């Protein structure tokens, strides 16, 4: 696992340089969920693949930008599932974007997730990593190395409300939930980049991020293996809670396909309790 952690630091620095000077153009290809790929998405994916090819403990890679699992070492232990550049369409307006990683043992199942990480490319280059303990927060220093800053802990109740999806497609239940949060004094914080929005809630020690089921995406839009579960792991290890709107945890999800999606909610315990009160 230490070798994977060190590789994530290398990847962070390489993708950070690409983000600074990238060609923002689109390719002529779509990924598995129908999104037209940006050249920067493809470049970020190739950087990650190249670095993990150097590690003998990595069995295979599963990426948002790859249709199928890419086997590297059949007898190895770890499967890396990742979104190479979450929020890439926001690079041209200079918003913070990020990379998300889930490290699974032997097979992609919720119960096999052993570690998770994300990298955020903003004014500063930062990374959060957990191997099952409290998430650790790192920041790149002037000497070119990542320094440990602190462990992350969510308070029982926050103040931030980051809610995604197009409002006209929300269910009435979700409208009621979001309205109840605003009535309590919650502040809207939503950039359109999952990494940036979830990072802000962690840094501010509480709140909720939601991407609900909608009329146009009844099974949600975010991908279970390489977006949802890695962040669920981080949030729950930080003392928070998660749900798909029905379950007590996103870890109750049974994964049947690589690019499976789900509605998802991540937050402090209070906000997830309120979710269940209103969703039923």
UniProtKB/Swiss-Prot annotation:
GO terms for biological process: fructose 1,6-bisphosphate metabolic process; fructose 6-phosphate metabolic process; fructose metabolic process; gluconeogenesis; sucrose biosynthetic process. It holds the Pfam family FBPase. It comes from the Bacteria. Mg(2+) 1 binds at residues 64, 83, 85. Substrate binds at residues 86-89, 190, 221. Its main location: cytoplasm. GO terms for molecular function: fructose 1,6-bisphosphate 1-phosphatase activity; magnesium ion binding. Its EC number is 3.1.3.11. One of its GO terms (cellular component) is cytosol. Mg(2+) 2 binds at residues 83, 86, 227. Binds 2 magnesium ions per subunit. SUPFAM superfamilies: Carbohydrate phosphatase. InterPro entries: FBPase_C_dom, FBPase_class-1, FBPase_N, FBPtase, SBPase. Keywords: Carbohydrate metabolism, Cytoplasm, Hydrolase, Magnesium, Metal-binding. Its cofactor is Mg(2+). It catalyses: beta-D-fructose 1,6-bisphosphate + H2O = beta-D-fructose 6-phosphate + phosphate. Pathway: Carbohydrate biosynthesis; gluconeogenesis. Homotetramer. Belongs to the FBPase class 1 family. This is Fructose-1,6-bisphosphatase class 1.
